[in-house]
């Protein structure tokens, strides 16, 4: 009966059903990812489930696109799933380089919370696809919003990787020798042996995590820069002004300045170890405020749908 209802709903409301499936698979994947620290076979299961999650979100977004007739990043519900897609894709790409249970253990909780927020916190009217206002009926919608959302995904992953570096070194001095340009301390192989997954985390692991964090943040910063530029061009085309300093634009600029300072300190000042890791970890809150926090103000051109109104 449950399966029968599921298939019926899948026909009439595929977006919601696929969204719920993603949530439940993430719910199953979370304890398995934590168990991967003790059983190496669990890491393979986690990776397979993450691939399935990414595929289901892709299907969900495609269904949403076919129903609405526009790329599905026009409201908060759609953007939350697109963000989750970006984080899962980033997780899978990193795991190709560094097969450690640390990666899914930091990514999956965020993915689960993001999907849970979309499924159970957002009001139903935000889950319904609606027609775009004339100003949003532009190819800039895909070029601007998708790039910004992918930058958020990369920046979140980078910040969480830095948090993991701080956590695994909380009771000992942190003297990272990894290179900010990715040359010195990047000792990662595609054939990293699976039997090393359950070994205690050594100093070299911190170097690798730190370098992965730096690279993720660098990618996110480049994408955010492109997103801000494309957004300014779009704003001038739609409203005749390059920048209006609404809350989202202001916090996007703050986020850009924050990560620019992080990269400057690492590249120009040679920061290594605990200080850049603390700075990058704090960046998670900056991105969270930029993406979700300003929605609680309910004002501006980028509110993504007022949550409670």
Swiss-Prot record:
GO terms for biological process: cytochrome complex assembly. The keyword Thylakoid applies. It is found in: Cellular thylakoid membrane. GO terms for cellular component: plasma membrane-derived thylakoid membrane. The chain crosses the membrane at residues 18-38, 43-63, 67-87, 102-122, 148-168, 216-236, 250-267, 279-299. Required during biogenesis of c-type cytochromes (cytochrome c6 and cytochrome f) at the step of heme attachment. This is Cytochrome c biogenesis protein CcsA. It comes from Prochlorococcus marinus (strain MIT 9215).
């Amino acid at each position: 009966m449950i399966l029968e209802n599921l298939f019926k709903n899948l026909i009439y409301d595929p977006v919601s059903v696929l969204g719920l499936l993603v949530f439940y698979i993430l719910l199953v994947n979370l304890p398995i990812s934590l168990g991967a620290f003790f059983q190496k076979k669990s890491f393979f299961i986690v990776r397979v489930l993450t691939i399935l999650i990414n595929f289901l979100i892709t299907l969900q977004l495609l269904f949403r696109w076919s129903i609405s007739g526009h790329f599905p990043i026009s409201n908060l519900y759609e953007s939350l799933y697109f963000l989750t897609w970006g984080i899962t894709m980033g997780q899978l790409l990193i795991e190709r380089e560094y097969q450690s249970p640390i990666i899914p253990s930091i990514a999956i909780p965020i993915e689960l919370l993001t999907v849970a927020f979309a499924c159970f916190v957002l009001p139903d009217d935000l889950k319904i696809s609606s027609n775009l206002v004339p100003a949003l009926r532009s190819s800039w919608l895909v070029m601007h919003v998708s790039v910004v959302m992918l930058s958020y995904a990369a920046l979140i992953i980078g910040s969480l990787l830095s948090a993991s570096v701080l956590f695994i070194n909380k009771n000992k001095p942190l003297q990272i020798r990894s290179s900010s340009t990715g040359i010195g301390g990047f000792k990662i192989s595609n054939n990293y042996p699976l039997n090393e997954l359950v070994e205690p985390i050594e100093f070299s692991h911190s170097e690798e995590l730190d370098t992965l964090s730096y690279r993720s943040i660098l990618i996110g910063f480049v994408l955010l820069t492109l997103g801000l530029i494309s957004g300014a061009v779009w704003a001038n085309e739609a409203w005749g002004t390059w920048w209006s300093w609404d809350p989202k634009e202001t916090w996007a600029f703050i986020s850009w300045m924050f990560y620019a300072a992080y990269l400057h300190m690492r590249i120009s000042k040679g920061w290594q170890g605990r200080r850049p890791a603390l700075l990058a970890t704090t960046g998670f809150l900056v991105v969270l405020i930029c993406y979700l926090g300003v929605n609680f103000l309910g004002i501006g051109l980028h509110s993504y749908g007022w949550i409670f109104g």
